[in-house]
Amino acid sequence: DRRFMLVSNHLSRFDPMICMVRFRRTPLAFVSKPGNFKIPLAGAFIHKCGYLSIDRENARNALTTLNTATEYISSGRLSVGIYPEGTRSKTGELLEFKDGVFKIARDSHAPIVVMTVSGTENITHNFPFRPTHVDMHIVRVIQPEEYAGMRTGAISSMVRKYMEDDLATQDRKNQNDTTAAVIS
């Protein structure tokens, strides 16, 4: 029942919805760009779910959003999901992380659930006629004791390394599966 901070790589606009299904028994809100709140119907839905708008162009407003996310977790209201890359990756490669987002976990003393996703980038191309295989891996749950006293940049580097290692393992597995299918 403990609230946590969920961090994941970001490939598609469908990532938060897929995560909400995966964590359906956990009250979970994401930090999202302001434009998403202007999308008809979807904007009202994410607002009602407690999503937080982050203004990446205004440091003071962004800090207010991070503080609100910290309060969500600390008060037990919601767990918070965030994409430390700050935007979707068009190539599937991890983009540079925004270290400041880890202030949420550090200040709320919350576990960090490290997750990777793959396949969500294909949903738009396949919908509605072909199903899309999506993989979600809970890579690691980092307890607050493991990052106590660390700066946000160090926490960011640790999380990124876990994600990179998991994505590399998935790539190797997928290459082996493809090779096995060709040989069969």
Go through each PLM region and give its residues.
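A short, glycine/Asx- and small/polar-enriched loop/turn
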Residues: 1-3, 130-131
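Non-catalytic C-terminal accessory region of glycerolipid acyltransferases
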Residues: 63-184
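Catalytic core of membrane glycerolipid acyltransferases/transacylases, capturing the structured
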Residues: 2-59
